């Protein structure tokens, strides 16, 4: 019992440090890779949207594309949706197109129901193993790529990110 009481201050200190790290975001799982100094061409892709219409990467040349790998069951992915809706409205006239690649295994019906309830204002395409591999494998979801008007990857982030922080990554690519 005395040993436990002697260690109590250390346990309290460890708990406080853990809480501070979590609150500061240092423990966040979001990872962003800056490609801005590189010319890394985004892979070409072609996928079907929820209406069965083909969407191809070459149709988006000249636009800034946010390509987000996600799933309806992913909590962090769902948390980012209101921000993406806001960014699509705010920057559409500057050439922004958000395209979300659903990795849901249950098929488009599940995704269609989710989209109808959430008010998403950007295209959703159904992903497959081919696009995941083309983008170097998806370490986790959400995984998001910012692709510039010339088709080069400028940013990659893994994990959820607050809208304001993501907008700071996006704005230089839109300019």
PLM regions: where:
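Hydrophobic membrane-insertion alpha-helices, especially the h-region
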Residues: 11-22
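Hydrophobic beta-strand core positions in alpha/beta domains
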Residues: 66-68, 100-102, 145-146
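Structural microenvironment flanking redox-active thiols in thiol-disulfide oxidoreductases
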Residues: 78-118, 127-134
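Alpha/beta-hydrolase fold active-site loops
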Residues: 64-65, 96, 142
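N-terminal "domain-start" segment that seeds a small globular fold
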Residues: 27-58
């Amino acid at each position: 019992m005395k040993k436990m009481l002697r260690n109590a201050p250390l346990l309290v200190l460890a708990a406080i440090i853990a809480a501070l790290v979590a609150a500061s975001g240092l423990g966040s799982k979001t990872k962003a890779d800056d490609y801005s100094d590189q010319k890394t061409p985004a892979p070409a892709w072609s996928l079907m949207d929820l209406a069965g219409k083909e969407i191809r990467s070459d149709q988006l040349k000249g636009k800034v594309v946010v390509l987000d790998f996600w799933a309806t069951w992913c909590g962090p992915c769902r948390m980012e949706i209101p921000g993406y809706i806001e960014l699509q409205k705010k920057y559409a006239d500057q050439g922004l197109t958000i395209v979300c690649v659903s990795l849901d295994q249950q098929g488009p019906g599940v995704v269609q129901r989710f989209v109808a309830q959430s008010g998403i204002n950007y295209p959703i395409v159904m992903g497959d193993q081919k696009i995941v591999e083309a983008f170097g494998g998806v370490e986790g979801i959400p995984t998001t790529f910012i692709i510039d008007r010339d088709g080069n990857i400028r940013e990659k982030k893994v994990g959820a990110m607050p809208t304001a922080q993501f907008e700071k990554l996006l704005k230089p690519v839109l300019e």
